[in-house]
Amino acid sequence: MEKRLRLAPSPTGLFHIGTARTALFNWLYAQKIGGKFLIRIEDTDFLRSKSEYTKNILQGLKWLGLKWDEEPIKQSDRISIHKSHIKKLLECGAAYRCFTSEDEISELREEQKKKGLPPKHDNRHRSLSKEEIETFISQGRTSVIRFKIDEKIVIKWIDQIRGEIKWQGKDLGGDLVLSRRAKGYEIGDPLYNLAVVVDDNFMNITHVVRGEDHISNTAKQILIYNALNFNLPTFSHTPLILNSEGKKLSKRDCVTSIDEFREMGYLPEALSNYMAFLGWSPKTADREILSLEEISEIFDLSEINKAGAKFSWEKLNWINSQYIKNMESIKLVEIMRTYWDENGWEPPSQEWANKLAILIRDSMTLLKDSIDQSKPFFLIPTIQKEGQDFLENRESKLSLKLILNYLIEKNTIKLNKEKAKEIINEISKKHNIKKGILMKSLRVAFFGSLIGPDLIQSWELFAESKTDRTRIERCL
C-alpha cells in the first residue's frame, strides 16, 4: 500500500514557521518510508482565505526545498462532495439539524460560565420530530448540521509520537457542528472537521502528521471516519514551537513568517536544518549540520519530543553561519551581488568578488551581513577615533609614508599576498619598525579602525581595485 502524507495549510496569512516545520516533518517522513508528500489548501474560510497567501505558502515550500509529488488540491473545489457526505450522515442518523440560534448559544454559555462549567452544547435538538423541524423552518430559523457524539464513548488511538491517547466523548464540547447555517432543508458550507476527513479519505492519506493543538480534533475526526466507514490513517502530533518564555510562538514574537526569515538573510538549507532539530532528538546523528537528504535517512517520528520546543535564535544563527562558511564562493557571490546591486556597488572582476566572498564569509552570520562586511571594500570608510589616535603616533605616519613610497617606486609590481608580506618584512627590517605598527597603520588606512578582516588578503583586494594608495594618502 502506498504511503501518503499531506500538508493542509489554511491560506489566511503568510507561511508561518510552525506550518513550515509541520511540512518539513511530513516531507522527511515521506522520504524515509518511500511515500508521497501532498498539498491540500484548506480555503473554506472564505472571509480570511486569500489567493496571495496560497501563493506565498507554495513559494515558501519551494524555497525550503520541499517538493510535493502531486498537483495541490483546494478544499473549496470540493464543497459539493463535502455536502454529499453530510447528507449521508443525516440519512443514516449520525447527524441532525440543529436550529439553536446564536443568542440561545450565548445564553447557554453564559449560564455555564456562571456555574464554572466549560462551554458545551446541550444537544437540545438531537431528537426533533419532522413536525418540529418543519415548524422551525416555517418560522425562518436557520440550521446547522450537528454530528452526534456519545458522551460515554472513549476514543483511543496509537499516536506515533505520544503513544496511546484516550479522549472521552463527554469532553468534546457536545455534538459537533459539521456545517454553517443554512435556510430550509439546505446544507450550509462544510466546516473543518468534516472537510478534513472527507478530503484525507479522497487523497488516500495514510499518515497524518500535525501539531498537538489538533489532538482534540483528531478525537472528533475519528468518530466521523468511523461513521463514514473510512479507513483510519496513522496519527502523529508534534510539539508546539515555543518562544523564550515557554509560550506558543506567535506573531507577537516579531519574526514568524518564512518570508521574514528569508529577508533577514537566512539560507533555506540552514532554516530547514534547524527546524528539523526543533523538537526532534535523533539518536543516530553525530553532527548537527545535515542536508535534507541526510536528515531524511535517519528521521524517525518516534524520536520527536512530546514537550514543546523552544525556538533559539542563537542556535539558528550558528547553523546559518556554518552554511555560509561552507558555501562555494561563486554561489555566495551570486547572492551577495543582490545586496551590492541595491547599494550601487560593482566589483572590478568576478575573481575579485570571489576573493572577497572567501575573505568575509567566516565573519558572516546572516547573508545581509555581507553589506557591512563588503562596504569598506567599495567605499572608503571614515577614520574612527581610535584610528585617529593611533595615527598620532610618529611611527604610524612614518609606516604609511614608507609603504606609499615603496608602492610608488615599484609601480610596476603586481601586489599579491606574497608580495604584501614581502613589503612589510622589508620595510620592518630596513627601518627597524615593528611589523605590528606597520600592519595596524595599514589597517587604519584601509578600514578606518584597528579591527577588520585579514589585512594581507584585504590589501591584495584593495590593490586590485586600485584604491590602496588612495586610502594610504588620505592619512598623510
Swiss-Prot record:
GO MF annotations, alphabetized: ATP binding; glutamate-tRNA ligase activity; tRNA binding; zinc ion binding
Enzyme class: ligase
UniProt: ATP binding residues: 251
InterPro entries listed in its UniProt record: aa-tRNA-synth_I_cd-bd, aa-tRNA-synth_I_codon-bd_sub2, aa-tRNA-synth_I_CS, aa_tRNA-synth_I_cd-bd_sf, Glu-tRNA-ligase_bac/mito, Glu-tRNA-synth_I_codon-bd_sub1, Glu/Gln-tRNA-synth, Glu/Gln-tRNA-synth_Ib_cat-dom
Catalysed reaction, written as an equation: tRNA(Glu) + L-glutamate + ATP = L-glutamyl-tRNA(Glu) + AMP + diphosphate
The family this protein is said to belong to: Belongs to the class-I aminoacyl-tRNA synthetase family. Glutamate--tRNA ligase type 1 subfamily.
Motif ('KMSKS' region): 248-252
Motif ('HIGH' region): 9-19
Gene Ontology terms: cellular component: cytosol
Subcellular localization: Cytoplasm
Domain of life: Bacteria
BP terms from Gene Ontology: glutamyl-tRNA aminoacylation
Gene3D superfamilies (alphabetical): 1.10.10.350, Glutamate-tRNA synthetase, class I, anticodon-binding domain 1, Glutamyl-trna Synthetase, Domain 2, Glutamyl-tRNA Synthetase, Domain 3, HUPs
Annotated EC: 6.1.1.17
Protein name: Glutamate--tRNA ligase
One Pfam assignment: tRNA-synt_1c
Functional summary from the UniProt entry: Catalyzes the attachment of glutamate to tRNA(Glu) in a two-step reaction: glutamate is first activated by ATP to form Glu-AMP and then transferred to the acceptor end of tRNA(Glu).
